[in-house]
Structures are given as structure tokens and as C-alpha cells.
């Protein structure tokens, strides 16, 4: 029996950095856990977050998410969180070593792509290892996107 599954409410994207794929050449992605307080999780469950200007940094053998914005939870009292605090990312030692090595030696950048809840209801961050694109690379990407869109229109018109 084929059953149509509804979208799992626990597996939802909270915030997405759509500009990252345009500004960076994504070479590798990795899933990382986030160390969050209770009010941060509640704020995320309401779908409020912004990771547009955020990045990850390797400091002291740990990886930190910097400049991400999780607004304060409105129903919280005086124990609310700071919206732009640094958040620690949870990774294995091998994964951390691999990421720190690529950032140090090859001049790559750690860019967050999206924050979401997995099947167990845990907040996860999709982290990309990327190299910044130059202006001509961005123009080339734009040309390819426009051409594929135009090609689709032409094929649709012909039937």
C-alpha cells in the first residue's frame, strides 16, 4: 500500500541562507548540532531565526557560530537569551580537525546554509566549507541560471 506521508513537523527548516550559494562556491557540507538554551529552542520552534550574515569560526579547538540572530522568546521572563550571542557547534573530533585544517591551510570559509530540526526534534545546522566567489564568477552563475530558465521556456513553447 502506498501511503502518502505528510511533512514531518519535526523535520522543518527554520532559517536558510540562500545568499550563501550565490556568494560562495560550496565544496563540502556537514551537519552540526547546536548548543542552545531553552528559550532559544522555543524561539526556533516559532520559526524565527536569521543566519544571513553569520559565519563559523574555529577557536581553541572548538567551532563557534558567530553573528546568528535568534530573537528573544516573548513569553520568557528575565532568564531570556541574548539574540546575537556566539553559539557552540557540536561535531566529532575528526570533523573538527578536517574543518579547521581546510580553513587554515586552504583559505576556505565556514558558511552556515540552514538551521532545521531533524527527526528526533534536535536543532541542527547545515555547515558548508566554501570559497568566496569573485565578481566574474557570480556573473557567470547568473548567466547560466538565466540561460537554463530561457531554455526551459523555449522547450515549453515548442511543446
From Swiss-Prot:
Transmembrane region(s): none
Gene Ontology, cellular component aspect = cytosol
Which portions of the sequence form the region Disordered?
137-159
| GO BP term (any one) | trans-translation
Give the range the annotation lists for the signal sequence.
none
UniProt-annotated location(s): Cytoplasm
Q: Which SUPFAM superfamilies match?
A: Small protein B (SmpB)
Recorded GO molecular functions are: RNA binding
Q: Provide this UniProt record's keywords sorted from A to Z.
A: Cytoplasm, RNA-binding
Stated family: Belongs to the SmpB family.
- NCBIfam families reported in the protein's UniProt record: PRK05422.1, smpB
Role this protein plays: Required for rescue of stalled ribosomes mediated by trans-translation. Binds to transfer-messenger RNA (tmRNA), required for stable association of tmRNA with ribosomes. tmRNA and SmpB together mimic tRNA shape, replacing the anticodon stem-loop with SmpB. tmRNA is encoded by the ssrA gene; the 2 termini fold to resemble tRNA(Ala) and it encodes a 'tag peptide', a short internal open reading frame. During trans-translation Ala-aminoacylated tmRNA acts like a tRNA, entering the A-site of stalled ribosomes, displacing the stalled mRNA.
Its protein name is: SsrA-binding protein
Annotated organism of origin:
Mesorhizobium japonicum (strain LMG 29417 / CECT 9101 / MAFF 303099)
User: What does the organism's lineage look like at the top?
Assistant: Bacteria, Pseudomonadati, Pseudomonadota, Alphaproteobacteria, Hyphomicrobiales
Amino acid at each position: 500500500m502506498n501511503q502518502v506521508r505528510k511533512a514531518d513537523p519535526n523535520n522543518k527548516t527554520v532559517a536558510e541562507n540562500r545568499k550563501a550559494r550565490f556568494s560562495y562556491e560550496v565544496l563540502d557540507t556537514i551537519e552540526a548540532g547546536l548548543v542552545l538554551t531553552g528559550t532559544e529552542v522555543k524561539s526556533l520552534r516559532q520559526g524565527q531565526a536569521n543566519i544571513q550574515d553569520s559565519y563559523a569560526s574555529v577557536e581553541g579547538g572548538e567551532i563557534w557560530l558567530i553573528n546568528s540572530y535568534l530573537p528573544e522568546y516573548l513569553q520568557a521572563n528575565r532568564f531570556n537569551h541574548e539574540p546575537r550571542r556566539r553559539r557552540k557547534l557540536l561535531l566529532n573530533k575528526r570533523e573538527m580537525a578536517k574543518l579547521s585544517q581546510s580553513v587554515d591551510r586552504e583559505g576556505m570559509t565556514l558558511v552556515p546554509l540552514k538551521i532545521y530540526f531533524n527527526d528526533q526534534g534536535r536543532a541542527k545546522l547545515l555547515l558548508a566549507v566554501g570559497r568566496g566567489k569573485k565578481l566574474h564568477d557570480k556573473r557567470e552563475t547568473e548567466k547560466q541560471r538565466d540561460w537554463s530558465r530561457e531554455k526551459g521556456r523555449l522547450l515549453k513553447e515548442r511543446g
